[in-house]
Structures are given as C-alpha cells and as structure tokens.
A protein has these predicted regions:
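Active-site proximal beta-strand in glycosyltransferases
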Residues: 3-4, 133-144
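A cross-family glycoside hydrolase active-site/sugar-binding cleft signature
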Residues: 51, 121, 141-143
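Short N-terminal targeting/anchoring amphipathic segment
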Residues: 108-125, 139
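N-terminal hydrophobic or amphipathic segments with adjacent small-residue motifs
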Residues: 20-21, 123
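A conserved catalytic-core segment of Leloir-type glycosyltransferases
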Residues: 2-15, 22-25, 30, 34, ...
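A short acidic, amphipathic alpha-helical/loop segment
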Residues: 128-132
C-alpha cells in the first residue's frame, strides 16, 4: 500500500523537528511523524509520502525549499511549490488553495504509481485531497 499524507502547516522535517520555530510547528507534526513511522513498520505498506508546502525563508533555514528534501527507508518528505516563496502561517494558506491544489495535482501526475490512499491533516489539506479524488479518483480520509 502507498499512503500519501498531506500536512501543509508548519516546518515539517523527518528528523529533528524544530518545535516552536513558528506558531504552526507544534505537536501535530509529532503525531504525524509517529503515525508515518508506525505505518512504515507494517509489511503491507511499501511507501509513505508526506507532502507539505515548500518555502524559502532565510529566518527559518534553507531546508524547507520545494522538492524532495528528505527520505527514509519507506518514508519520503516532498515539499510542493505553490508560487509563493515566503513562509505562510496557517491562517494565510486559504489564500493559496488554488495554487496548492495545482501543485499537488502536478506532484501526483508525476508519480509512476498513484497513492492508494490520501490522508489529509486539517482543512487546507482536505481541499487538496478532495481535488485529487476529483481528478484521479484516489480515496482520502480527513482528520482535523
């Protein structure tokens, strides 16, 4: 099974999460990583992509640039580019829904194999998951 998690808020990394770096970089990231790592231990799960928003902000460091930035055995972190390079707090993501959907669909189009399931974390990610279902028919679950 290939699971794609979408979590757009905060400064997500696979290791050494900078908790508190921004107001949006908190416990929800810890729970997401624990879920991904526990799922990776399941022999039926062969791949997990964590998709988040990429940005360039010298105050926050260079590691948040768009692209595939980190990889583990089964878990990969992918940062999509929505055309706005600045870090955006969660309250401002709603202004980028169209661009984020376009970037997420482009990421999915570029995959040889589509995810079996998308797990969207919070409302903004739910909008992307719904769009992926419309375009590709990929089922999704939503937690907020």
């Amino acid at each position: 099974m290939f699971i794609c998690h979408v979590a757009l808020q905060g400064c997500l990394t696979l290791q050494d999460v900078p908790y508190g770096l921004t107001a949006d970089t908190g416990g929800h990231i810890k729970y997401l990583l624990e879920l991904a790592n526990a799922s990776a231990k399941d022999p039926h799960v062969h791949r997990i992509d964590l998709v988040t928003r990429g940005f360039v902000d010298s105050r926050l460091g260079e590691k948040f640039r768009p692209g595939e930035s980190e990889r583990d055995d089964k878990v990969r972190l992918v940062r999509i580019a929505d055309g706005e390079e600045a870090y955006l707090p969660k309250e401002d993501l709603r202004h980028r829904h169209r661009e984020l959907c376009d970037a997420f669909i482009a990421y999915l189009r570029g995959l040889r194999r589509k995810p079996d399931l998308i797990h969207a974390h919070y409302a903004d990610a739910g909008i992307l998951a719904r769009r992926a279902k419309e375009v590709f028919g990929i089922p999704y679950v939503f937690t907020g």
